[in-house]
Amino acid sequence: MIQGIDYAAIAPPLIVVLAAIALLLADAFDVPRRVLGAVSGGALAAALIAVVALASGGRRATFCLPGGLRGNGPASCSYVADDFTLLFQGVVLAAAVVVVLLSLREIADARMPAGEYHFLLLAAITGALVLVAARDLILLVVALETLSLPVFALVALRRYDGVASEAAVKLFLVSVVSAAIMLFGISMVYGATGAMHLDRIAPALQRLPDHLSPVAGVGVVLVLAGFAFKVAAVPFHFWAPDVYQGAPLPVAAFLSVVSKAAGFAGLTIVLALGFPAYGHVWGPVVAVLAAVTMTLGNLLALRQRTAIRLLAWSSIAQSGYMLAPLAVGPRRLPEAVAATIAYVALYAVMNLGAFAVVIGYGARGKRFAALDDFRGLARTRPAAGAALAFFLICLAGLPPGVMGLFAKVVVFRATVAGGVTWLAVVMAVNTVIGLYYYLAWAARLFAAPAERPSAPVLAEPGPAVRAAVAATAAGALVLTVAPQLVLQAVTAAS
């Protein structure tokens, strides 16, 4: 028998989904765009306050089933609001507030329907919030699809735009295939263990008969493949560059940060709580995925000449770094999970900041801003140029971008401590490769502005975009001064 619902535990996603419904209804009454944007941002801020309030209390859970044959054992819960969940929900909501700020001008310039845009965005955020709290495979899949489905529409919401429509179709097709692969894997895991809750799957896998072990192993790998799509790991990455380029830029930022963070949360939950007994199976798979992902992402980023495609391939390479600690398998798994989560949290600030500057200061009237369009930005707009240069240096992991260096050191240390030394060497080589394209773009910012007649005219950002750039820059500065705060919080949560 399922217990009553703990509404306090589900308060963050509940606030967001109620706001999404209210926005959809308000759009029918021709409410001004600014009001819709204010409601959207206010709902996310309220949900963030709810997360902070929950963090001051203890662990909460809901949708629970009694454990044991007679219902007298520990309960298995589908939704758990523990420190891990609240940490990720905080990251998702903080990043989502920045995405809303970046979206306000984009909605007006691209003449997108504001009500539909904010409804779809909040619906996707609801899926992300539930995903990081899910503790059974059914809720994980439902949350993952709740996150994915609105994004298809967001990518294509710029009507009469063939590039956006093509990107949406590509994202939809790849997502459908990956969902089918994951569902097939879940069915195999359920067939072998007879359980859907992760805390019941883990002991069931430990005592599995030999004839069911191959079935469970294949199921584990297929579930991993489904999450590999969400985090854009090679070879499930090929949707990312075209979708980032075709989508509205705030949606690309959402995919690069919020969607990726939720995907890594789901992946670590499944591997650490559900499949630790099969670490000898998924550990080597993750190691190969990490090595190939960071290598291909960095090599193809070297060839890019537009800002968004460079950020897309850079994001793919960063996924490889995030995967690397998980390659240790069951050995030192808590430390590996903490390293991955810390990297995700620090990456969210760095990458979202870079997107904010590109969105706010890209060449006016150009759909795809080239890297050369930002030449001299630090001379004409010193604050924006310095901010973008700082974000790029952080992503490269080079001082004075200490937060980026700290993130890479944490991941490198966890990988070496777990005994996957060859992967640490691959990561070190890829870090050197990444220095080239990050520093090449940063150098353009301080070069003399282009004097050719066709030189682009940079856009003037509105107050919302300026606030987004300022917020991410402030966060990056704080975490550069004290990056250990993130690792301490993550270690306590994991």
Task: State the predicted function of each range.
Residues 1-494:
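Alpha-helical transmembrane segments of multi-pass membrane proteins predominantly involved
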